């Protein structure tokens, strides 16, 4: 008897992407905060909202499939040729495109773990084998082990810096050594989704380093610092052959009319954006200092979140957080990632974590 459509056997082994949990409805008057998805607490810049309203009048038309104006804006902002830029529906879409354009059955994709949850998913969807390399005990990438994991079957390497969820960075020296050790036919993606929040001068500079390598791409997003998570826009910067491969695997008309206009407008007011990012970085410092003053172990972060390596206490802390009106991101048996959010949310988090550790 026909039981319905037959799907690829490999799908049974692929976990679904698990997004940050939304707060449960409350009836006790306590304001609930979602600090589980690394979202920007600020709304889009005023001029961006205006552009969104204007663009809404044109959604009866297909968007520019080549995102020409947005690509021009990104190229000017980054100081790179337009031929070095590809855009897509969020950085995660580009992760899919990198996997689809480089790897298939019998191939391997290497990445640190724990890191961005999409890496093993996009690898498996492409039919390739994920190779997860454990982080160091301090939450940093083990770059020597990452290089050692590259074999003749490796087609793609993801490096997340600042790393999600630990907030640690790969240094320029580490990246240079890694690129020198990896064959130039292996694609390396430096995922800089949180780079605007980084203040570590030793952190790898993707936009400088990619110019020296045909096989290095830089991945960025408008979801975090720019506060456009709901519009889904990400971009990659790499040499033209890489961009051509990404464009061949892109979803046609993927970036909407509104998303293209809003992202381009977001690049036009650097001063206000920097002020907002600086405010979040200052809050990150305040939160980190408050936690450490209370004896809470917290990893030094260069992103818009902090990581508590709670181990077996993770679930208990997540449950207490939920009860207190804070929905955090828990990774069972490992730790909790908490977004730097509104001041009230940050204050509640400091108090909760302090009480928990005490």
Predicted regions located by residue number:
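N-terminal "arm"/small-domain region of PLP-dependent enzymes with the aminotransferase-like
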Residues: 1-61
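Short beta-strands and strand-loop turn motifs
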Residues: 130-134, 156-162, 188-192, 299-301, ...
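PLP-dependent aminotransferase-like
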Residues: 101-159
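Phosphate-binding glycine-rich loop
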Residues: 63-108, 126
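PLP-dependent enzyme catalytic core of the Aspartate aminotransferase-like
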Residues: 173, 319-358
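Conserved PLP-binding catalytic core of the aspartate aminotransferase-like
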Residues: 137, 280-281, 289-324, 340
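PLP-dependent aminotransferase class I/II
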Residues: 215-292, 296-299
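Active-site pre-lysine segment of PLP-dependent enzymes
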Residues: 124, 141-152, 165-188, 192-225
């Amino acid at each position: 008897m026909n039981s319905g459509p037959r799907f690829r056997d490999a799908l049974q082994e692929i976990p679904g992407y698990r997004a940050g949990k939304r707060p449960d409805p409350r009836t006790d008057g306590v304001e609930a905060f979602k600090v589980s998805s690394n979202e920007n607490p600020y709304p889009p810049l005023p001029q961006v909202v205006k552009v969104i309203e204007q663009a809404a009048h044109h959604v009866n038309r297909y968007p520019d499939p080549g995102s020409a104006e947005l690509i021009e804006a990104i190229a000017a902002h980054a100081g790179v040729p337009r031929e070095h830029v590809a855009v897509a529906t969020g950085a995660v879409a580009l992760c899919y495109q990198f996997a689809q354009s480089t790897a298939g059955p019998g191939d391997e994709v290497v990445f640190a773990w724990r890191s961005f949850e999409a890496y093993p998913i996009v690898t498996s969807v492409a039919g390739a084998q994920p190779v997860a390399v454990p982080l160091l005990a301090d939450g940093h990438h083990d770059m020597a082990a990452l290089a050692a994991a590259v074999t003749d079957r490796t087609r793609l390497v993801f490096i997340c810096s600042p790393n999600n969820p630990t907030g640690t960075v790969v240094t320029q020296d580490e990246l240079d050594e890694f690129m020198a050790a990896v064959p130039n036919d292996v694609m390396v993606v430096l995922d800089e989704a949180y780079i605007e929040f980084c203040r570590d001068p030793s952190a790898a500079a993707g936009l400088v380093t990619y110019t020296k390598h045909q096989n290095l791409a830089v991945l960025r997003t408008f979801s975090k610092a720019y506060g456009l998570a709901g519009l889904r826009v990400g971009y990659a910067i790499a040499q033209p052959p890489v961009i051509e491969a990404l464009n061949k695997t892109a979803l046609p008309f993927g970036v909407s009319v509104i998303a293209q206009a809003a992202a381009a407008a977001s690049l036009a007011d650097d001063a206000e954006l920097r002020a907002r990012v600086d405010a979040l970085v200052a809050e990150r410092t305040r939160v980190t200092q408050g936690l450490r003053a209370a004896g809470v172990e917290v990893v030094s972060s260069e992103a818009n979140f902090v990581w508590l390596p709670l181990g077996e206490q993770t679930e208990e802390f997540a449950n207490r957080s939920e009860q207190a009106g804070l929905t955090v991101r828990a990774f069972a048996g490992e730790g909790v990632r908490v977004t730097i959010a509104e001041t009230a949310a940050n204050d509640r988090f400091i108090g909760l974590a302090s009480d928990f550790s005490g």
